[in-house]
């Protein structure tokens, strides 16, 4: 009769800590493995590796409304879907983020739209 997985689990469950320690050492010797925790690679150090990583999400920020505040408020409403008062408050409170988590192409289009309306904007 063969030993089943359940028999092994029952035997291991009945062992003391010292016996389990000896069992682990025996496994290491028999199979040439290590019970040490696997080291997970952390984030790359700042510098060359970080610079090589391309940013995929951008935040479009309104830096200032410029001279054409009404046009900028209209552009902000169009971009965000905010109501008139909320868009005006956002424009009045510049610098403020207008749209977050957008891709590079969308961010560039939104910045262009804000600049055409008379605002000073950037994507980061």
Curated annotation (Swiss-Prot):
GO CC terms, sorted: cytosolic large ribosomal subunit
Keywords: Ribonucleoprotein, Ribosomal protein
GO terms (BP aspect): translation
GO molecular function per UniProt: mRNA binding; structural constituent of ribosome
Family annotation (InterPro entries): Ribosomal_bL12 (IPR000206), Ribosomal_bL12_C (IPR013823), Ribosomal_bL12_C/ClpS-like (IPR014719), Ribosomal_bL12_oligo (IPR008932), Ribosomal_bL12_oligo_N_sf (IPR036235)
Stored Pfam families: Ribosomal_L12, Ribosomal_L12_N
Function: Forms part of the ribosomal stalk which helps the ribosome interact with GTP-bound translation factors. Is thus essential for accurate translation.
Database matches in NCBIfam families: L12
Family (UniProt): Belongs to the bacterial ribosomal protein bL12 family.
Known partners and oligomeric status: Homodimer. Part of the ribosomal stalk of the 50S ribosomal subunit. Forms a multimeric L10(L12)X complex, where L10 forms an elongated spine to which 2 to 4 L12 dimers bind in a sequential fashion. Binds GTP-bound translation factors.
Name this protein carries in UniProt: Large ribosomal subunit protein bL12
Organism: Ralstonia pickettii (strain 12J)
